[in-house]
Amino acid sequence: MENVYHKFHIPVMGTGHSIDSPIRVAHLGISSVMSIVDDILIEKICKHYSQKYSIPVEEVAKSDLYARSKRITSYLNLVDKIVALKLNELKLLPFAKGNEKTKYFELLPDDSSLKEKYKSFLKIENEEEKEITAKELTELMHAGSIDVNIMSKVDRTNYAKDGSILSDEFSDAKAALRGYAESTLTSSIVFSAGFNRTLLGFLAQFKDFYRDANGKIKKKIIIKVSDFRSAMIQGKFLATKGLEVSEFRIESGLNCGGHAFASQGFLLPSILQEFKDKRSQLAKEFIPLIKSYYEKQNWRFNESDFNCEPLLTVQGGIGTSGEAKRMIEDFGCDSTGWGSPFLLVPEATCVDDDTLSLLMNAQKEDLYLSGASPLGVPFNNLRNTGSENWTKDRAESGKPGSPCPKGFLISDKQYTDKPICTASRQFQKNKVEEISAMQIPESEKDELKNLWYAKVCLCDHLANGALIKLGISPKTKSPQSICPGPNIVWFNRQYSLQEMTDHIYGRGESLVSANRPHMFCQEIELYVNYFEKLLVTIGSSEAEIKYLEIFKENLENGIEYILKISEGKAYPNENLKSIPDFVKVQQDRLKSMYAKRTPLAIAVNF
């Protein structure tokens, strides 16, 4: 995060909603993350921006064995050029009220050294001194980081035209990694959704992930984690290959957008406190392993280059400046991630108008943890999207499932030799026939069928909103999906980038109601809801009962810790006083549902 002046970043959102965020905001110093899982979408977006900025991009032949990685590299190189172009144009501007150059500095946090220098500049009356300071400020302008994300779970094996399996380097995630590694970007790659050893091991093939002769790393590694143990395991694995984790990005398991990877009842404050208490262990454990690798390779190991701890950032459900300040001041985080609120900032993200309207008008009941993902992982969803309606219409017309045009999420081999997607027409036809043949009541058959009908073609539909917004695809042929976190309900209109940034930094009037419960309340409720579903879906074996008991104990301990936090002093724009009464309701729910539990040995399906 060198030369990054802001205390927040815009996380990855879907495959398409932040696909061009760096083009929109990086020249203004704001860092954001793009998904690089969908090279088909990326190729279309690349063509669009190549034409818009008159920057030629070489077309990649479909027959090219490295087509996927080359498409990704082409787009990332294009984004790099566009951001550099926009930043240079910004630098050439004079400091004038209301222009983009002034906006760059107005967006900065008030306590940053660059903002203070800018404020001092505004007070200078001597023209010569003002001109010198203006040049100094201009030289200090840097773009936000153009970061990318790979979901570690999305790592499909690919096949040659003759049906033979291609070598591991051509799997989806590794090809995407190659695409980033061979780009011109100096930024970071975020790995999310679990620990993929072969994927992380593939990093060692590319020199940009190692320190150069000057001790600098061109491409840094960020690991998204949900607990300290995961950070330690993945960090050690990388260290044995001489690779450093520059940042651990901690995310709430349920109070987030997209796929939800619930912890075993651990709430965010407890997780953050453990990171704070044990932070020094990270570098202490990793550096000796990195040093050993360097020595084996006969590389120079400069102690001073390695005497820093990984950065810690946090995201998931943060909705006020006070909550963000607590993350930084009390838990020692270096910055915060703000995702879903930026879906309502057209200057920053790419959301089609119909979906934008749904987001602005969304009520609590419109946001739900669904079984829509073909990965079998709970998925944060919004009701009445084009995707949801399209999926329902197909099921009701007797033609359930998607043609599966992209196939990134294929994983099931119940009916085929090669994996297929559970949202596909092929899978659902087989599944419906299987259910229809079962000797059970028709009502139960319908219930089982509906569980599978709920699966959505996320590969295609998460990309469509961006294609519609940019005028690349018509909305009549592009059902659009979106995956906001529950926090979006407190934001109810379109916002300018200045408004949202001011809200994050606590400048001016808050964009959310003063009655909004604290983010910790939201997370508690989500975990109690999740536990309630576990009680009626998990089996009755000794191991499963033990799992429930540990989950409940962790949840109760986390709630007690949050109550303790609520007794302290609140930061401005932080609703700590909402916690005690809210917690009492959830504690009563938890106690009541556990007393009435009737575990059933059926599959979990959220």
Region annotations inferred by a language model:
Residues 1-199, 366, 370-606:
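Long, compositionally biased, glycine/small-hydrophobic-enriched stretches that function as flexible linkers
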Residues 15-19, 208, 260:
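Membrane-targeting and insertion segments and their boundary/processing signals
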Residues 144-150, 199-210, 280-299:
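Short, composition-biased local secondary-structure segments
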Residues 159-163, 217-223, 310:
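Short, basic, glycine/proline-bearing loop/turn elements
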Residues 169-223, 234-240, 247, 251-258:
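Extended, well-ordered protein cores
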Residues 223-233, 239-391, 396-397:
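Glycine-rich phosphate/ribose-binding loops and adjacent secondary-structure elements
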